[in-house]
From Swiss-Prot:
Listed name of the protein: CLAVATA3/ESR (CLE)-related protein 19
Gene Ontology MF terms: receptor serine/threonine kinase binding
Positions bearing carbohydrate: 34, 54, 68
Annotated organism of origin: Arabidopsis thaliana (Mouse-ear cress)
Signal peptide residues on this chain, from the entry's feature table: 1-24
One GO CC annotation: apoplast
Modified residues annotated as Hydroxyproline in this record: 65, 68
Phylogenetic lineage: Eukaryota, Viridiplantae, Streptophyta, Embryophyta, Tracheophyta
Family: Belongs to the CLV3/ESR signal peptide family.
GO terms of biological process kind: cell fate specification; cell-cell signaling involved in cell fate commitment; regulation of root meristem growth
Keyword field: Developmental protein, Differentiation, Glycoprotein, Hydroxylation, Secreted, Signal
Length: 74
């Protein structure tokens, strides 16, 4: 009984993996046919680099307060 359940589980996982692979391949081929696959990849690289640069710029402008805490003076 356990073997039958394992076989059903294994076959369903194989079917899901095959469907996922075919969906990603078809989407990739659609994007490549339109010529936007490489452009989209470059935009994603630029966006990720831009967000990294922006976050580091914000971190460098942050002011670290030094001196007495006004909340403790109450």
């Amino acid at each position: 009984m356990k073997i039958k359940g394992l076989m059903i589980l294994a076959s369903s996982l194989l079917i899901l993996a095959f469907i996922h692979q075919s969906e990603s391949a078809s989407m990739r081929s659609l994007l490549m046919n339109n010529g936007s696959y490489e452009e989209e990849e470059q935009v994603l690289k630029y966006d990720s680099m831009g967000t990294i640069a922006n976050s580091s710029a914000l971190d460098s402008k942050r002011v670290i307060p030094t001196g007495p805490n006004p909340l403790h003076n109450r």
